[in-house]
A protein has these predicted regions:
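His/Asp/Glu-enriched, well-ordered alpha-helical/loop segment
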Residues: 8-12, 16-143, 147, 152, ...
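Histidine-centered active-site/metal-ligand motif
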Residues: 2
């Protein structure tokens, strides 16, 4: 849990030991203005190292850490993909070499989150026999500019295949 500040030499150990890193992407964008001063240059190399963890073969469990951060998953997906806050700062993203792709970020909040909860046989994806918990949103998040991901709004929520919110 909270695998956000890891000694760089320990990053490969997650995959080697089958430890599942859990990340809260909005922590990086909330912490970006103070992390350098508080962690120092050496420790910052292993901070919020999502790309390094994925490249080492890890699944990443994404979450919000609500109520510390807001629960909206699109805030976290935006932060994971852009490494920017909701004002889209800094330009190019903070520690941009650690960005995730949109597919990786979506997996971290869906399939891989279910895997981390030992629930991947029941939830996390849409497939026959799964619970069919899903949302409809106001935009095609694959086609929208990454800087706009955080603005995504939920139009409808289905739980167990039944409409619960519209």
């Amino acid at each position: 849990e909270h695998a956000q500040i890891v000694a760089p030499k320990d990053l490969p150990r997650f995959a080697a030991l089958h430890v599942l890193p859990s990340m809260q992407p909005t922590h990086a964008t909330s912490d970006k203005n103070m992390a350098g001063d508080r962690l120092g240059v050496a420790r910052l190399r292993g901070a919020y190292a999502w790309r390094s963890l994925v490249d080492d073969g890890n699944r990443i469990v994404g979450g919000s850490d609500y109520p510390v951060e807001l629960a909206n998953p699109f805030f976290g997906i935006h932060a994971a993909v852009t490494r920017q806050d909701q004002q889209n700062q800094p330009a190019g993203g903070w520690l941009p070499e650690q960005k995730l792709t949109l597919v990786e970020a979506l997996r971290s909040f869906t399939v891989d989150a279910a895997y981390g909860a030992f629930q991947d046989q029941a939830m996390g994806s849409l497939a026959p026999g799964m619970w069919a918990d899903f949302i409809l949103v106001d935009r095609d998040i694959v086609k929208v500019a990454p800087e706009q991901l955080w603005q995504t709004k939920v139009l409808a929520t289905y739980v167990g295949g039944e409409l619960k919110y519209q």
